[in-house]
Curated annotation (Swiss-Prot):
Function of the molecule: Paramyosin is a major structural component of many thick filaments isolated from invertebrate muscles.
Name of the featured protein: Paramyosin
Family affiliation: Belongs to the paramyosin family.
Residue ranges of the TM segments: none
Subcellular location: Cytoplasm, Myofibril
Classification via Pfam families: Myosin_tail_1
Segments forming a coiled coil: 32-855
Amino acid sequence: MSDTLYRSPSMAIRSSTADMGALTSMSVADLGSLTRLEDKIRLLQDDFESERELRNRIERERADLSVQLIALTDRLQDAECATDSQIESNRKREVELSKLRKLLEESQLENEDAMNVLRKKHQDVCLDYTEQIEQLQKKNSKIDRERQRLQHEVIELTATIDQLQKDKHVAEKMAQKFEQQTIELSNKVEDLNKHVNDLAQQRQRLQAENSDLLAEIHDQKVQLDNLQHVKYQLAQQLEESRRRLEDAERERSQMQAQLHQVQLELDSVRVALDEESAARVEAEHKLSLANTEITQWKSKFDAEVALHHEEVEDLRKKMMQKQAEYEEQIEIMLQKVSQLEKAKARLQSEVEVLIVDLEKAQNTIAILERAKEQLEKQVLEMKSRIDELLVELEAAQREARAALAELQKMKQLYEKAVEQKEALARENKKLQDDLHEANEALADANRKLHELDLENARLAGEIRDLQVALKESEAARRDAEARAQRALAELQQVRIEMERRLQEKEEEMEALRKSMQFEIDRLTAALADAEARMKAEIARLRKKYQAEIAELEMTVDNLNRANLEAQKTIKKQSEQIIQLQANLEDTQRQLQQTLDQYALAQRKISALSAELEECKTALDNAIRARKQAEADLEEAHVRISDLTSINSNLTAIKNKLETELSTAQADLDEVTKELHAADERANRALADAARAVQELHEEQEHSMKIDALRKSLEEQVKQLQVQIQEAEAAALLGGKRVIAKLETRIRDLEVALDEETRRHKETQSALRKKDRRIKEVQMQIDEEHKMFVMAQDTADRMLEKLNIQKRQLGEAEAMTMQNLQRVRRYQRELEDAEGRADQAESSLNLIRAKHRGTVAVGKATDVYVVEED
């Protein structure tokens, strides 16, 4: 076996008869080139559509290559069959040659003469064979040059393999780093799960608090309805009290006019009584004079009495009758005078009662005015407080709506990030599937190339066997030159057949070389196209990812700004909470003051009730201790004048009370309207709180979905790690770049996961802040509800005071009505007394006229009147 030495610029490779190693190195070089091509093709699978197109193209090219490889295998099989048939024919020829040797040995003696001719012919044949051998050597030199080129490629492939091994080592380090990062991410995920559980507990607690708040709000609504009903009743009672005051004012004016008339009538009655007393004195004086005259006439006419005894008896009887009549009239007049005195005393007592009642009414009116002023102040303070609370509630509602809008924006951004994450996960999965398919296709191509390498090695071995067989046949021919004269024709035929077969083999080898060169050119062109497409795709993806990175940076900036705005709003809300707490303290102080005022009013009411009892007892004592009629009349005149002034004051006070009641009614209407508005705002605030709670529930459900997605992504990351390990084990050389690409994708996914976790934390913090704000708003609503209840209590107390005032006004009106009835009765009695006085005067005039007539007759007739005891 001869050895040949081939040198290259990088190394020298020794090839011997065992050229299988060189051919296997060629197959390894082809495998390296194909793996390099597959590696470059895998780099083009970043985008889904471009990957699909490239994969289809590669599959079509692979199908073409498989068809060509099948054709080549068929040709190699045909060549193998031809070589087998040639070997069998050679064996047959060897058998025939052995037979021919025998024949030659037998015919050696016969063919000695023809040896020279055959030797010449044999020399010609040897020349032909040498020419053929030279041609075969040229072909072998060409094959050796191609083998050297392939060896150079093998050297380059070994260098690339070393580089890939280095990349693999770096990738293993990165994989370890990624494993550590996955462990850290799993820890973070556990922390997030704990945080989600805490949020769920907070959500349950918030739901319980919300249900309690809804129950309290329902109770407050019921209380508001009751207070509105009570307010309506109080308004009706105020209207009735206003009407009663108007009626009392009218009755008071009528009573004042009647009192004036009674005063005039009392003056006339007093004058009449003076005249009657003067007339009675004169009548008594005249009676005494008449008695003296009678005594004188009695002494004078004693003598005549005896004469005129019968006449005197008649006259005396008449005088006695007249005297009895006069006495009866005097008694009647005295009775009338006593009745008048009694009426005067009764009127005096009633006037005193009226004065006491008027004083009480004045006191109650002053108390009511003070209470009304205090109530007006309280109503104004409560009104201003309610306005402030409404303004604060509206501001809180606006802030809550702004916070909800910000939360909605954050939610939309979070959903977009989740969708991008899902799209990346889907793309990663598709890339993994494509990588698996490409690895399978690469394994198939490697297997087929290995089979082709084996076929090439087998063909090379057959060629070497043929060369050996040719050499052996040449030696056998040289040995059998003397004995091959008879087989020369057959040898010539064998030569021709061998030439034909060698020509066919050469043509087949040339066709194989051309086809291999064509395939190599086509693969290089496809590789160039794939590299161009890969560069274009890489540029496009670079731009795409740069745009996505810019968008992510913009979203991060927006989120930072939103975070700053949220912090500002939190500061503003904290300041508002401080202001609300200060306002709450002020309202509590005002409530305490109102309670103190209410206690003072209660004490005043108790004192007034005690004074009322004392006045009743004093009135009874005053009724029992009546004075004389004249002093009572004079005091009655004085008190009537006082009553007139008091009545005028009462009218002014009544007008003032009416105006104040109208203003209080208007204030109460405004307070009711504001209470209705506050109720509606509270309802709206509760509706906003319910919507915020519902959005909180939705956000928590969304966070649970995100946790599920996170778990699925973790499982996908684990699967990717397993697939990466499998790809590393399967790809050996060309999978490093794919691993690096997948590692970059995993890093991107991890960065996206970190971003999503950060956003999730931010959203959770925003949710916690909104929960705190909702709690604060609920606390404010509770405080406002308490203030509203306090205001309702104060309104109830005011209404109770108004009812008391109305009752007192009704009692005063009843007393004024009673006084008016008494005055009217007194007027009727005075009229009756005046009538009786007129009758008494007329009767006195008649008595005087009769008395004058009787005196004149006595002087004319000298009649003596004897007075008998």
